Every structure is written in structure tokens, then in C-alpha cells.
Curated annotation (Swiss-Prot):
This is Acetylcholinesterase. It comes from Mus musculus (Mouse). It comes from the Eukaryota. Predominates in most expressing tissues except erythrocytes where a glycophospholipid-attached form of ACHE predominates. PROSITE patterns: CARBOXYLESTERASE_B_1 (PS00122), CARBOXYLESTERASE_B_2 (PS00941). Synapses usually contain asymmetric molecules of cholinesterase, with a collagen-like part disulfide-bonded to the catalytic part. A different, globular type of cholinesterase occurs on the outer surfaces of cell membranes, including those of erythrocytes. This is the catalytic subunit of an asymmetric or soluble form of ACHE. It catalyses: acetylcholine + H2O = choline + acetate + H(+). Its EC number is 3.1.1.7. It is a peripheral membrane protein. Belongs to the type-B carboxylesterase/lipase family. Terminates signal transduction at the neuromuscular junction by rapid hydrolysis of the acetylcholine released into the synaptic cleft.
Amino acid sequence: MRPPWYPLHTPSLAFPLLFLLLSLLGGGARAEGREDPQLLVRVRGGQLRGIRLKAPGGPVSAFLGIPFAEPPVGSRRFMPPEPKRPWSGVLDATTFQNVCYQYVDTLYPGFEGTEMWNPNRELSEDCLYLNVWTPYPRPASPTPVLIWIYGGGFYSGAASLDVYDGRFLAQVEGAVLVSMNYRVGTFGFLALPGSREAPGNVGLLDQRLALQWVQENIAAFGGDPMSVTLFGESAGAASVGMHILSLPSRSLFHRAVLQSGTPNGPWATVSAGEARRRATLLARLVGCPPGGAGGNDTELIACLRTRPAQDLVDHEWHVLPQESIFRFSFVPVVDGDFLSDTPEALINTGDFQDLQVLVGVVKDEGSYFLVYGVPGFSKDNESLISRAQFLAGVRIGVPQASDLAAEAVVLHYTDWLHPEDPTHLRDAMSAVVGDHNVVCPVAQLAGRLAAQGARVYAYIFEHRASTLTWPLWMGVPHGYEIEFIFGLPLDPSLNYTTEERIFAQRLMKYWTNFARTGDPNDPRDSKSPQWPPYTTAAQQYVSLNLKPLEVRRGLRAQTCAFWNRFLPKLLSATDTLDEAERQWKAEFHRWSSYMVHWKNQFDHYSKQERCSDL
């Protein structure tokens, strides 16, 4: 899904001579940049030269591949980022730069549904670059800024993906849009908590450094540093939530949009102990420290820094504690620093009085993940599963569940009039994964933030794109609202329908209205249906589809009461039972061993001569 836009050129008979002259003067692109002051910007690090791009309705300015940190290579691997040192001359910012080193999805080679999320630039650990799109010419007055944080399970993703093209929002809505790369997987989230060599959460620190860069430099592009909105999807949305919960980040933005992800999701963080276990297991898998000896943190990290990046990526998935889906190997850690406590605790105790938040989900959050390991599922058939496959899928989809908790999930999601129906079982499995990992954490976050003083708006996205290549049974999968938010249907070459183009314009307006005012509604349009705030009492949210806005109440309220209220209590109770059972078994084992020992001693005693005389 790559929009076929190219830099604007003005045809001229004199162009070949002009090009030759400019080449002799030091390069056509550089000279063209000097001729157009709109494409030259000075930031704190030095001067940049951008590029003018076509977009529907007119051109935009793009400044691509701007370095905001020193390359995190060599001894900087696993370390917090360092700000980019100043450069001399004019830095070329006309093309995207490297993608951070990561796992590449090869499950369905050549299939657009997976390839659109795979890296589209060279993989490298030298990857900390950001991009800025602005209206052309530059805004005369400070313009609200939108900062995009991509998703990808904290193990993949890139700001340069075609689906994140910022030109449409910049041109149609007059927004200043920023996106950044951040380290993922082992390189961004391997943690030995308490260690200076690999403290963890450096991918989040990459994001924070980019936010600081925006505060220092965005005014030069026409952006308003006093009106910054973060928005992200999936792990990007979880990242946005973690910046909300991390005090040093809170002064760097003013509003937040969380699309299909939260910091309180069961996949979004791990404890310090689990992070250390995964890091040391990865080290052992790649032969660190050499010889298999114990070694301290410094020796372990020094060894890991010598290993090729691909070796680390190849072993990432082997550190997960059990077979699962929607679980990722290296993710943010509750480190006592970036995250001073668990996200749940911080959400419950935080003060969000001055915060405006937009949160939401898509209709079928779980379906995308089922083809990555749940028995019976594939993109190439209807995935009509048996009850046995459903039961096995629940254990993979809710990996932390005890036997009793898994049985409760099965009980809740089974259609007891048709308990063996393959279609229902398939759809129920999708709902289990989506509700558990996305929908109910979003509902919980919306309620808690609203209760703590934030102004919250909520949505469910229900439109399946006419161009979608995933099978019909997957519905509206995770991630497939993004193309509408970024305005890709406005590109006629991508073959969206007219209705989808109008729908995309509507969504772009909602998102940019929210970025400007903290309210997605247009204050100049009193005739259109209004999007009400989400409150703990009314729990109002809207459906986003080709129809007019519809207000609903209670986002999967009954089901989310199961996940957010009942199941945690059940898990807590069964944890106690499991511990009691473990202790009982240990005591029984000790007692049994004692009895065997006693019987052996008794038998030995009985065989002695004095006993035989009795």
C-alpha cells in the first residue's frame, strides 16, 4: 500500500541546462532547496533541507529522516539515547532513513496484509530518526502538532510505513505531523533492572527524546509546542498511555489518542523479575557469557553487545514463559523509574484533571492474531474450528489463566444452545482474544481516567475497508482503522470508494479537531450528530462507520465486567488455592518421605536378633 506520489517538478525546456548548472554548483537537490526557503529549516542541531510532495489539493513540505539521537550502536546498545550532536552544513532530509532492527513477518510471503506492516527501509541499529510533514507554505501562525507512535507489539514497526504517510493530514487538515522511529524488541526493551548497562525501557526513552526534540524545534516548522497531541495504535497506544503515566513525559504533550491499545493491557508490561529472567535466558541462548559461566550483569551485557543483531532477533521468541498469542518477548518493564508502579496502580492514583483523551477499538480486535498460532485458524480458509480447538485456543489466548479461570472463560463465551457450532466457536475465539487484550483494557482505562478527572471520548470503529485483503471472517481487524485516520482513501490510485473517501475526511476532521481543542466535535457544525464525552455514569461512546455518528452506551459492558472485575478475583483466589495445593503437596511429600524412612528404620529394627526372641 504505497501511494505513488513523487516530488513536485516544474517541466521546462531549460531544465536539462539548469540541472547541469546546478550539478556543477554542488547538486540539484541542494540548489533547489536553497531556492525555496520553505524547504530550509534551522533547528538546534543545524540546518535541514526538506522536500515538496504532492498531495490531493496541493503540495506539502516533508522533512524526512531527521536524526534526533546519536546512533545507539556498539557500546550504546541497550543504553538510553543520547541527543544528536550538532552538524555542519545543510542536512538532507528528503528521504526516510533506516528502520530499527527487528523481526520480519514471513508467515505469508508476498501477502499484502502482512507485507504492509513489514519494514520498507534497510534494517539497522542506527535508526533514531524522525519525520515532519507541514502544510506548504509553512503556517503563518503556530499550528497544533500531532505526534504519531507506531505499533507492532514492541517488537516491530517503522515510522516510514506507507500507511503512516503524514502528507494527507498536513494538506487536508493543515496539521503539523511528526513521527519517530524507536528501538523495538531486544534492542529497545531488554532489561536487567537496576543495571546501568541495560536498564530497560530505552525504546520509551527514545520516544521521550523525540518529544523533547519537538518541544525544542517544532516552532521552526510552524508547529505550536504548546499544543501537542500524541496518538498511536496498539503498542503505540500503550506507549502513549505510558507517557501519560510517567511524570517526566507529561509536560511534553497536552492531549492523547489511544487506538486499540493501553498501558494496562495484559501484554503491555512485565515485572522487573520477569524482565530479568527473559534477558538472562536470551543471553544463555546466544552463548553469553562465554562458556556458560554465571557472570555479572556487566559481563553479560558486554557479551550481548558482541552478538550480531540478527542472532538476538532470531532467539527473541524463545524467552516467552508459555505458548501464547498477543504476548511479546521484550516489552516495557515496571522499573521504578519510567514506570514508578504498575500501570493499574498509576491509573488508579493519578491526577488527570487537565488531560483530554480519545480512546477506542475496532470491531474485531482479536481476529488478526488467531492466524499466528491458534489451532485451526488460517487466512486461507473459513477457520471453522472444533470445540477441542476452541478449548486449546483459550489456553493459548489467556496464557496466565489457571484451570478454573480458563473454564470460566469457556463458560462465558460458549453458546450453550449450539456449543459445538464451528462458526460460533471461531467468532468466540476472536472475541476472547480481542476482549481480553484490547476492548476491556480500553474500557477500564476510559472509566478510570474519567473518574480521575480526565475528559474522555470513546469510539468503536466498524467499517471494513473495501480494499482489505484479509478474509471476510476476520471482519474489521486490529490496525485497519489507521489508513482512514491518515487519509489514504484520498489517494485515487488506491481504489477506495467515494463513500470511504468521505468517511476518511470525517475521521481526519475528528482527530484534528481533538488535537486543536480537546473535543472531536466541530464547534461550527451544530447540525451533525455530536460525540459526547465518556463518563463513568453514562459510559457513552460512538460507532464510526459509513453511517452518521451513532451514540451507544457501555462498551461490551457485561463482558468487560467479567474480564475487569470477576476474572481478576478468580485468578487471585485460585492463585491462593494453587499455592495452598503446592504447600500441601510439599508437606505431603515430606511426610511421605519421613514415613518411608521411618518404615525402613522400623523394618531394620524388627530384623534385629532381640526382636526375634520376643
